[in-house]
Amino acid sequence: MEHFATGSIETHKDSQRKWIRDKGPVVESNMGWIEVYIDPENIRAYFEGWVAIVDKAKSEKFQKLVQNSEQVIPLLPWPKQMEKDHFLAPDFTTLEVIAFATDSCPLGINIPNYDDIRDNEGFKNVFLGNSAKSYAISAMQFATEEQSKILSDNTPRCYEVHVACHELLGHGVGKLIYRGADGKIPHAFVDPVTGESFESCYEQGEDWNGKFGPISTSYEECRADTCGFYLCTLREVHTLFGFDGDNEHEIKTMLWVNVMNQFRKGILGLQMYNRETSKWGQAHTWGAYVFS
């Protein structure tokens, strides 16, 4: 309430610190001006406030992913020096949303967005179970009758794995590399695609949003999505969610379902594109369109 009365960012940051330290609650809630996704300039955040009940039973599989994260993170296709020195294992729960006051209800949330808190104190992940159910129903657009049957039967279970990897290991991994006081890049990084050494990094005082400007949030969503699609195919990950790692058809179906849902999101995202200004009004949909 003090934050709403004064507008103090530090007060809101303190509330987020208390929130991430509240591990394993029965009731979850959070509010504030959190995301900047619908501002083309990525500056003005919009309000969201929600209250939900934690589904303890369904949360177990997400906690397994958290517990195994230190074994999964090294499987990502980039140098280990680009990862945090220590992964701050977050709370990861499945929620049944009671009320969500905002423009739309997402499938998963990874907050707070304050980089200093995320890097040094941690964050929380939540999967919105009843939001995912409605998403599965709407996923039938742009599909044939046969495809609709596959999507209807498999979207909740398959997309759950993608969202889990997207939130925990997409948004939750990696760090910004800053040039040292001696003017050198602190590690000899090699581009995993080209094999060439990196010659640039962040300068002191720079950050992600400032460096990439209007594309920063969409770029971040692309990063998280590609992590999700890559990781969900790994035995070390999908078996945690009950998939049979030896069943090639099941794993191919999961990847197909997840990619098809992404294509759908990219097509629907055109609703958020302003032809007059050549700008997108939502970061997730722009990222999905680029991916598509």
Stretches with model-predicted labels:
Residues 156-169:
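Short alpha-helix carrying the canonical HExxH Zn2+-binding catalytic motif
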